[in-house]
Amino acid sequence: MNFNSTNPYYFTHEKNLNNASKYSELPIAYQEIPLQSLPPYPKVASKLKGVVAGGKENNIASFQKPSSKATRPYIPSYTRLTYSVPPLPIPPPSEQSLDTIIYRNPSVSSSQSQEPEEFFLPLDDGKKPPYSYAMLIGMSIIRSPDRRLTLSAIYDWISNTFSFYNKSNNGWQNSIRHNLSLNKAFMKIERPRNLPGKGHFWSIRPGHEEQFLKLKLRKPGVNSRPAPPVQDVTSSTKYGSSTGSSGFNTFNTSPHIFNQRHQYLQNYYTASLTNIPTISNVNATNFHPLHSQQPYVDTPGIDAPSDLEAKFSDLGVSSVVSVTSPLQSCTNSPSPPLSSPASSASPSESLRNESLGIKSAKSLGLNKDDAPVEGPPVSHLEKDVETPSVHDSVLGFNDTVTNLGKKGLKDGTTNTLQIPAVRLPSLPSSPTIKNPSGLLLKRSNSIDFPTPPKALCPKLFCFRDDIVADDYTKFSLLSPIRSDMSGISASPNTNLKEHRTRILQMLATPDAKQLSSLTSSDAEFWSVTPLKSSILRNGDASKQVTLSESPKGDSLLDGGSLSYFTNNISSVAGLETPSKLPMSKSFDTFEDDFLDPMDMLSFENHFSDFNSNRKVSPVKREVRRKYISSATTIHSSAAQDDTYLPSPTKRKMPLLRQTSTLF
């Protein structure tokens, strides 16, 4: 059997004849070698020799040299058809050279393909810049001539550009190193051997430049946007004149502001009140806040004052409407200049005016007949016009302005209707915050709320009939109780006494009706509580209740005398005792020594006054066993324990134990 006929790698095999056309473009070395001259597979020795002690392998077998010409290269048969050239390995970014890096400008816009020196220099105000560490690195690299910097050069650029990052504090340098190694937008470049110095370079990876180029197109917020400068407007070029020229022709922007882009971008950060345009040499008739009866003249580019206001608001200039009356248009007599606060206010304040509801005369819904005559400047009219209250703001700001305008026309006054400064009810003015008109407001001493009617304060809560409106501004409106605070005292006892009086009157208890007649001194007042009405006593009650007037009995404190004593006290005081003493008349008398320290709710003070000089504490409930009379029965002790010594937290004891301890 021929070896070549069974070899699948030879074209002569019938299985590979169809695939011969695929390899027609092989090099000449593959095509011109005759198949018969190529040797078969090399023969491998049947027994392979092992590894010697030295660790080197012995030669297994040697290939047979080809018998063809020596000029033709020898290619083994088993690699002839499967041979392919692998792609060259791509070195890592750290091994790239400077010559292999190609910077491609992004195709976003032509302005991004500028040179490094054309980028604006960030403004340094001494504070921490509003940029991340990655953005600072990108700003430094993208502004370098070669678009590459060493680590020390990045440190120098950041510290020289921003004074906040000084070299004395090395904390930010650690953050720079971490961002360089972890951020995918930066790559490390090895320094060429022929370039003096030490340290590798850092550059921006191709394709990541856009995020750092966006910085030069970044715009600040709306509040910090400065308005373009406005030239002076003369009386010859006014809105509404018959010249037919556009109103924007008089507002020429200075061309030197936009010569250099970095200078224009720096203006965003240096916006202040000094950059706001000021309008001078303008007649007061041209800047009246309300529309007049004169019809508007069609002007190319401007259809109505609303369009003018909209375009001016886009430019950051306060809305200005020039309106003249028929009489003034005929006479053309100049008037004193008007200094409007809106012209000196910043764009942020003009936006705040719109949010607070200050609208133009057209949006307020005023008719042509409501147009007033020229009056004093706006800055002098705030004292004459009252600030609308909360009630007016609820009815509607438009109705308030309309009513004020009609009132001024009926009276025949020549004062101009001006829109007063509006202040939100929930936001009181502060000494440091200006109102929308630009004038400093002082903090009001009282609450700007309407006086509540007396129907909201019933007589139960109001103890004075001569309540005036000033009383509602002294204290919080949340307090439902109003007492006479003319004699305010800092003594806590006095305050507690007044508080008890107010609570008794508010609850309308029976004790409160006779509180003033029964208590003639502070000592008697402190003994009065809503829960202990039977202990009320005064000079008359103490005189009537004596030992001699008590009924005859075995002792003073037997069952009959005790009930008579309590009934007499309640009848003298004119009050009704909450509960009767449910003591039985069948038990024997107690000794005086036992009842003295006894803590009974209804008669503790009576016996302490008559029999002893000391007052029993309401929390002391000690009873000594030796003072208990032998005639005391189980029934009487159990009744006393359940009635006069309630203890919901204690467990009930057996009856035999209660006989000995009463607990």
From Swiss-Prot:
InterPro entries: Fork_head_dom, FOX_domain-containing, TF_fork_head_CS_2, WH-like_DNA-bd_sf, WH_DNA-bd_sf. Its main location: nucleus. It is found in: Nucleus. It holds the Pfam family Forkhead. The keyword Phosphoprotein applies. SMART domains: FH. GO terms for biological process: division septum assembly; negative regulation of transcription by RNA polymerase II; positive regulation of transcription by RNA polymerase II; regulation of transcription by RNA polymerase II. Residues 128-222 bind DNA. The keyword DNA-binding applies. GO terms for molecular function: DNA-binding transcription activator activity, RNA polymerase II-specific; DNA-binding transcription factor activity, RNA polymerase II-specific; RNA polymerase II cis-regulatory region sequence-specific DNA binding. Keywords: Cell cycle, Cell division, DNA-binding, Mitosis, Nucleus, Phosphoprotein, Septation, Transcription, Transcription regulation. It comes from the Eukaryota. PROSITE patterns: FORK_HEAD_2, FORK_HEAD_3. This is Forkhead protein sep1. The gene is sep1.
